[in-house]
Amino acid sequence: MKVRFCDEFDCGFGWIVHEFMERCSHALVEDGRVWVIDPVDGEGVEERIRAAGAPAGVIQLLDRHNRDCAALAAQLGVRHHVVPHGSLGPFAFVDVRDSRSWKEVALWWPGRRVLVCADALGTAPYYRSGNERLAVHPLLRVRPPRRQLGALQPDVILCGHGRGVLEDAGTAFREALSTSLRRIPGQVASALRAWRATRPS
């Protein structure tokens, strides 16, 4: 699969699939060890991961985000951690949803103030309303995860759908959580436009 590398910053990088869902995956690097988050495999991905350091593990933040997590973990010779709890390496995990149909944790890297969300927050066009830089998942806009995530103060936010927010992430984060409900009409319109744009002419 063709992917485009993105979200380059001093603690890692990402890669994104050019499609309606804008699936985005990430590699986080700490002390020469590389943790891979919700990966979709693609051209050059394994090589880029190995070039960044020694593979340490593959982390799946959402129960239905199987993607290529298991296959890539096997290729890299590391463990596949599915919706982990507590802590792992330098990361802590925050429960976002825990229902029969939706089990999701967010990855919080306190030492670097990096937040990674699988589905709860995103930047893909069908997530956003108007000029939003970051948005709550369409199905969570009525009850956004303020209680779960609101105390965090991220400097970088990486998403499972869409490119990350690498500048002034805190402002985008607070706005997304506080305005999600009133921006529902705009989000619906944006999602329709995004869907139409991907349809063959």
Model-derived features: positions:
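Metallo-beta-lactamase
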Residues: 2-13, 17-20, 34-36, 98-201
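Short acidic-hydrophobic surface loop/beta-edge motif
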Residues: 6-7, 28, 85-89, 107
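Pre-active-site segment of Zn-dependent metallo-hydrolases
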Residues: 17-57
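A generic local structural motif
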Residues: 21-24, 43-48, 67-69, 101-104, ...
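Active-site metal-binding motif and surrounding structural segment of the metallo-beta-lactamase
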Residues: 42-87
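An acidic, phosphate/nucleotide-engaging active-site surface
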Residues: 84-90, 96-99
